Curated annotation (Swiss-Prot):
It is found in: Cell inner membrane. The keyword Nuclease does not apply. Gene3D superfamilies: Fumarate reductase/succinate dehydrogenase, transmembrane subunit (1.20.1300.10). It comes from Edwardsiella ictaluri (strain 93-146). Its main location: membrane. GO terms for biological process: fumarate metabolic process. The chain crosses the membrane at residues 26-46, 61-81, 99-119. GO terms for cellular component: fumarate reductase complex; plasma membrane. Coiled coil: none annotated. It comes from the Bacteria. This is Fumarate reductase subunit D. Keywords: Cell inner membrane, Cell membrane, Membrane, Transmembrane, Transmembrane helix.
Amino acid sequence: MMNNKVYKRSDEPVFWGLFGAGGMWGAIFAPAVILIVGILLPLGMFPDALTFERALSFSQSIIGRIFWLLMIILPLWCGLHRLHHMMHDLKIHVPASSWVFYGLAAILSVVALIGIFTL
């Protein structure tokens, strides 16, 4: 007997990939940036390492822009993916929840992209 069902292709692997990348990025790079910018620099360590001019030139370079985009966009996708599945787990049914959460992540990613590249 043959099974002639046509299965709908899922878009979930794309979102799981962004979720995983955002979680990994947030676990590895975000604590390092918080440690350096939020703790070590205010304590006066490395006073010449992050002057305004150096920070601005890094942020305006292509590597710096990509770094800041990844710092913003990947954890954003991770967080909104978690919220989407948390609502499902708590049985709070948001109408068109995939469109709401992933659409919001896409819109905020575009806003971040515009903001970073107009810096």
